[in-house]
Design a protein with these regions (language model features):
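Short acidic/polar inter-strand loop motif in beta-rich domains
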Residues: 62-64, 109-112, 131-140
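Post-signal-peptide N-terminal segment of Sec-exported extracytoplasmic proteins
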Residues: 41-69
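An anionic, turn-rich surface loop/hairpin at beta-sheet edges
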Residues: 88-119
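Short coil-to-beta strand junction motifs in C2/discoidin
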Residues: 66-72, 142-143
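C-terminal motif of bacterial Sec signal peptides marking the signal peptidase cleavage site
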Residues: 16-18
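Bacterial signal peptide processing site
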Residues: 20-23
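Noncatalytic modules at the cell exterior or secretory-pathway interfaces
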Residues: 50-57, 118-134
Length: 143
């Protein structure tokens, strides 16, 4: 079993208008040095907007994360209705093993695009759920 110490310390979700206006929604969660692999992250957005938005995920990590990429399952929901579900893969390092993202010292922040110019449905009680999609080879169970 892998140690939980390698998981990200901060998780940020942002919905930004396509026209570079201030964010429609931006929130973050701090973890005590780790994001438990069994824990879903939930962001309650509330109401939507009638303008297309960019859905982005910001992740801060350090050298304790032992992988060169990350797999996430991202869901956009309202109540029990699933509006959008994607399995996402993002590179976290370049080919030489150097961290991607911005920052100095050991902490790097990566801006990960989920959807560009996405038209949110005009409904209330929207939320975004993010969870790890890392799997051991040949297993359906998450790490």
């Amino acid at each position: 079993m892998l140690s939980k110490d390698y998981i990200f310390s901060v998780f940020i979700f942002s919905i930004i208008f396509s026209c570079s206006k201030p964010p429609f929604f931006m929130d973050y969660l701090n973890f005590d040095g780790q994001w438990p692999t069994s824990e879903k992250v939930v962001f309650d957005i509330g109401t939507s907007t009638d303008q297309p938005v960019n859905l982005m995920i910001y992740i801060r990590n350090n050298q304790r994360y032992p992988f060169s990429n990350i797999f996430l399952i991202a869901r956009l929901k309202t109540g029990d209705s699933l509006l959008l579900c994607d399995t996402l893969e993002y590179a976290m390092t370049n080919a030489q093993g150097q961290w991607l993202g911005k920052g100095f010292l050991e902490v790097k922040e990566s801006k990960l695009w989920w959807k560009e110019n996405y038209e949110l449905p005009t409904i209330e009680n929207l939320n975004v759920q993010l969870e790890h999609a890392l799997r051991f080879n040949g297993s359906e169970k998450s790490m």
